[in-house]
Amino acid sequence: MAQFFKAKPNSSKQLSAKLSLSVNQLDHLGAGIAQHQGKVVFIPGALPDETVTVQFTEQKKNYARAKLIKVDTPSSERVEPECPHYHTCGGCDLQHMSLSGQREHKEAALLDIMAKFAGAEGGTLSPELTGEGWHYRRRARLATLFDKNTKHLSLGFRAASSSNVVPISQCQVLAKPLSDLIVPFAKLLNQLTAKASLGHLELIAADNGHFAVLRITKALNDKDLAKLSAFAEQHQIHICLQDNEGQFQGVGAELVLPVYQLLDDKAESDAVSLSFTPGNFVQVNGQINKAMVAQAMDWLAPALDERILDLFCGMGNFSLPLAKMGADVIGVEGVAEMVTQARVNAKANNLDKLTFFHGDLSADLSLEPWMGKIDKLLLDPARAGAFESLQWLKKMKPRKVVYVSCNPASLARDSAVLLERGYRLQQLGLIDMFPQTHHIEAMALFELTK
């Protein structure tokens, strides 16, 4: 039987060679894109209009990946990263690009994919929702790593595409008061007798104070609890422990829940307060979240007694403001704990024109008690999108649909469904929720035309 020789695509010679490439654009993950011998080459850290020296790390039939060795001709958008941990930490991936350049890239990428699938054009674009480029995160989870040999506990973030923990002393995108707590917390945790059994540390900045949630795998002794309590008092922070069952316990005091406000830029009577447990999802950029909610209210323009459905409602981030403005709101969420918290928030704000349901929004919705004719629809799904939920549009027939997206790909796919059902894209806007990263969020307004 004849045998044919086939060269191995990833030979050491092919991968070790260095070459110069010209970068022409960024991909959706923020990596530079170049062309070489008919292949697309992805180069993390490279920017458009740059000439770079690279070394291949992976070769496939139609594409390759390369490591940036040197920037030979820099882009005018290239800047020096502000964070000393940038090149090892996996949190940010665009600090080497100017903030204006990041936003220009994100808006162009959003418009490009939405033009292909939803007929978006330049005139459809609304002004970007932008805020502070640094210290904007009000929440972050730090990983811990205990070294059995040195008996030292490291506190930091995971490296890119790795489970390795990169110890950090600061975070340039985390709220400054929280960033300033990283080193003191690392010292404190290393003083605990139970440091080998500690899990992650979550830091939260809320309108009613600063919070820390420490994951533990076994109960702490009195000495460790006393150290945590003293630290909490010294740094004016609420500390709570989360055990293996997901239960939370306050340290040195009763458990206090973090709270944030919405619509508080108007009259005090218009504001709504949302409390959440450390396990609940909240938008990490408080400044942009307020702007996002305000824009959704403006686009939906809720009127008195209108029936508005809020799918993937979480703990009421959009539902409560809609009800505050007079609409009859139905919120549906797939996570039971979030539904419970949404009901708590509605009661705390004395909002009775608001009903929450727990349900699987990817399942058959035809028999759900809330299914039926509505005036308007708001969607805020996870990255997977809302494709299954949109199959029931004929039964709901909303005049307006506001879609809040954290994934342009699923937004584009779902937009095609809306267009098929007789809706037209009226407005599209970038939401820069995560500056210094490649992540793109957006809001789209669709109106029924037939």
UniProtKB/Swiss-Prot annotation:
Q: Which GO terms describe its molecular function?
A: 4 iron, 4 sulfur cluster binding; iron ion binding; RNA binding; rRNA (uridine-C5-)-methyltransferase activity
Chain residues that bind [4Fe-4S] cluster:
83, 89, 92, 171
Q: Does the keyword Glycosyltransferase apply?
A: no
Q: Where is the active site?
A: 406 (nucleophile)
**According to the UniProt entry, what is the EC number of this protein?**
2.1.1.190
Chain residues that bind S-adenosyl-L-methionine? 283, 312, 317, 333, 360, 380
Asked whether the UniProt record includes Amino-acid biosynthesis among its keywords, one would answer no
Key words of the record: 4Fe-4S, Iron, Iron-sulfur, Metal-binding, Methyltransferase, rRNA processing, S-adenosyl-L-methionine, Transferase
What InterPro entries does the record point to? 23S_rRNA_MeTrfase_RlmD, MeTrfase_TrmA_AS, MeTrfase_TrmA_CS, NA-bd_OB-fold, SAM-dependent_MTases_sf, TRAM_dom, U5_MeTrfase_fam
Tell me which residues make up the TRAM domain.
12-70
GO annotation, biological process: rRNA base methylation
Q: Which reaction does it catalyse?
A: uridine(1939) in 23S rRNA + S-adenosyl-L-methionine = 5-methyluridine(1939) in 23S rRNA + S-adenosyl-L-homocysteine + H(+)
Domain of life, source organism: Bacteria
Q: Which NCBIfam families match?
A: PRK13168.1, rumA
Question: What role does it play?
Answer: Catalyzes the formation of 5-methyl-uridine at position 1939 (m5U1939) in 23S rRNA.
The UniProt similarity line reads: Belongs to the class I-like SAM-binding methyltransferase superfamily. RNA M5U methyltransferase family. RlmD subfamily.
Q: What is this protein called?
A: 23S rRNA (uracil(1939)-C(5))-methyltransferase RlmD
